Amino acid sequence: MADNFNFELVSPERLLLSEMVTEVVIPATEGEMTVMAHHAPTMTTIKPGVVSVRSASGKKQDYVVFGGFADILPTGCTLLAESAVPVEELHKDELTRRIEAARKELEDTELHEHKSKLEHFIMELTHLRGVVQQD
C-alpha cells in the first residue's frame, strides 16, 4: 500500500483541496510529474493542464489549472495555481474564451519574446481543450 502525504491545491480565489493523498500527477512545464510520498524536494512551474489526484481512500479527482508553481517536499505538495477549477465545473466555452483572449493579445503585441510566450500558451490551451473535451 502506498504511503499518504498532504496535498493542497490553492488558487487566488480559494483553497480547492487539502487532504491526504497517495499520488498527484501535475502538468509541470518540463513534462508531467507524478508526486508520491517521500518525493525529493522540488520546486517547479506548472503549465495549463489537468492535475489528477488520487486520495487516500482511492477516489480520483481531476482539476484544470492555468499555470502556477508546485512546492514538493517528502511530506507533502502544495500547488499554487494562477487559476484552477474542478474539471466538472469547467464551462465548455471557458477554454475557447481564454484562447481567443490570448490570440487578441498576440495581435496587439510588438515584442518578439512576448509573442513567443503567447504562441506557446495558446498551443497549451488548445491541447488542454482537446484533452478536457475527450473526458
Swiss-Prot record:
MF terms (GO), sorted A to Z: ATP binding; proton-transporting ATP synthase activity, rotational mechanism
One GO CC annotation: proton-transporting ATP synthase complex
Keyword Ubl conjugation applies: no
Protein keywords: ATP synthesis, Cell inner membrane, Cell membrane, CF(1), Hydrogen ion transport, Ion transport, Membrane, Transport
Topology versus the membrane: Peripheral membrane protein
Quaternary structure note: F-type ATPases have 2 components, CF(1) - the catalytic core - and CF(0) - the membrane proton channel. CF(1) has five subunits: alpha(3), beta(3), gamma(1), delta(1), epsilon(1). CF(0) has three main subunits: a, b and c.
HAMAP family in UniProt: ATP_synth_epsil_bac
Family: Belongs to the ATPase epsilon chain family.
Xref: PANTHER family: ATP SYNTHASE DELTA/EPSILON CHAIN (PTHR13822), ATP SYNTHASE EPSILON CHAIN, CHLOROPLASTIC (PTHR13822:SF10)
Annotated protein name in UniProt: ATP synthase epsilon chain
Taxonomic source organism: Rhizobium leguminosarum bv. trifolii (strain WSM2304)
Lineage, highest ranks first: Bacteria, Pseudomonadati, Pseudomonadota, Alphaproteobacteria, Hyphomicrobiales
Gene that specifies this protein: atpC
